[in-house]
Every structure is written in structure tokens, then in C-alpha cells.
Curated annotation (Swiss-Prot):
Keywords, comma-separated and alphabetical: mRNA processing, mRNA splicing, Nucleus, Spliceosome
Protein's GO biological process: mRNA splicing, via spliceosome
Primary gene name: SPP2
Region Disordered: start-end pairs: 1-65, 142-168
Subcellular location: Nucleus
Stated name of the protein: Pre-mRNA-splicing factor SPP2
Keyword set includes Transcription: no
Cited PANTHER family: G PATCH AND KOW-CONTAINING, G-PATCH DOMAIN AND KOW MOTIFS-CONTAINING PROTEIN
Protein family membership: Belongs to the SPP2 family.
Pfam families assigned to the protein according to its UniProt record, in alphabetical order: G-patch_2
Subunit details: Associated with the spliceosome.
Amino acid sequence: MAGFQMNLKKDKINKPNSQSKPKISFAFGGSKTNIIPKKSIASSQKNETRKLNPNALLGSESESEGEDAVVAIDSFDKKKGGAIAGNKAVNTKVTEPLIIKPTTASRDWKEEIRKKQNSMYIPNQEHRQKVIAKDDNNLEFGLSVPEKSNSKESVVDAESNDTMSKEERIRSSLLKGEELDDKGLIIPIPSEDEIVEQDISSKPDEDSIEQYKEVPVDQFGAALLRGMGWKQNKGKNIESAGKPLLERRKKGVLLGIGAKAVEDELMADLLVKRGAKFDIPVVRRNKDLNATK
């Protein structure tokens, strides 16, 4: 900065008879203390870059994140992670793409309960069915033979069951196709209120306002598409998993959305090509009888 400077100087040798008069000198210009040579600035910047913590290039320095660090970037390579300082990448943190999975539509839980209840097996359900009584007074024609009682066989089975072990009884009952004894197990069927409570408890918590603010607005659409199965580096015309490619429907002339293509002859008549004529049959009609001939 420009300024004004005044210095007062005295003689070093004091003569006895002469009066000492101070010498006054004036100087115009900037102060010498504020002037810094250019070489010192360049050397100080080099020293700062040399004294830089090597861990700062990897983003793992112990200092606070708010302080700025001087990093000399030599090149830029997208495959290696962006900016490169020397042989190392400046930012080695790999950020995964944001994915937002859409929630399912509101389900009709009452209908689901009815389907589950109808599909459940209810024991001894055959006993609840209506029994059609047989009429014993019906007359039967032909020779009637009375059925023999199996009392002897039942006595033999009871005696054999007493001598058999539990494993043998179970094995014989399975071979004969008999049903095992009911142990009285009860499977509780949840009510509608309990199912609603289970459905509410299984759903995730609502997102807070802070979580909404963390999602960038410009990345919301791509994140929602990724949640629905979209892949960024995959084009439309690339065939995958043996699925056929989508073909565009050829839309004919004078056709709207959802209309089908017409035949070639009718299309030629609509376009009024050369030699195309509309044939209208002439019918003779009797006015009195209002009948055709």
C-alpha cells in the first residue's frame, strides 16, 4: 500500500561547540514490510503441498472435515474414480446408486381372510354334513341275503392289540388305512382385528421429513425406476434372457389408437389410386308394395 514515511536522524559524533541538529528525510511509496517477493510466494505454496498429509488424498485424514486441503490434481479418469493426484485417486469412496422400491397397492385383507379360512382344513367336518336317512321299509326284489356279523374278528383284533407294542399298533393302523387317535391339538384361527394388527406391525415405519430431504430431486426418478427393475446401462433393443424384442405396431393411414389395419383393397379405395372405383349396386324398388325385385 502507498503511504508517507518520515524519519528523524541524529549525528553519531557530538561536537562540543556545535549544536546537534536532527536530519529530516522523506520517503514516498509502500512500506518495506508489506512487500513480499514473488519467489517467496511460490516457494511457500510448494512447501504447503509438500507438507500435505498423504492420507488426505484418500479422504482419511484425522483433521476436521471443514478445513480445506490443497490437492494437486494431475489427471482425471472416470473408471478409476474421477480426479487423480499422482498415482492415487482423490476420492475413493464408491457411492452406490439410490434405489427406491415402490410399495404394493392397498390389499383387500378381508377377502384374503375369507380365502384363508375357506382353504383351512376343519377336522370332523364330515360329521357336520347333513345325513340322508334311508328308508328301511323299501321293498327289495330278488333274493335277500343277511350280512354276517364280524364279532369274532373284532375279538381277535382286540386280543392282538393288547399283546402288540405302540410301534406295531401304529404300523398296523397305517397299513390298514385307519386314522390315528385325535390328540386334541387346537390351531387358533386369528380374527379380523388380529390380522389387521399383524398387517400394520409388519409394515415399515413412515419416512421422516429429514429422510425426504436427503433424496436429491434430480435423482428421484432414476431411483424409482431402479426400484422397478430398470438398469441404466441396458438399452431397449438389447435382448436379454431369451425374451423377444418389443416390436412397434405399424399404424396404417386414417387409423386411430387401438384400430386394426384394413385390407389392401379398401386402403387403395381410401387413397383414391388410379383405376380404383366405388361399386354401388343399384336396386329397383316398387313404391306401392315397398318391396324389392
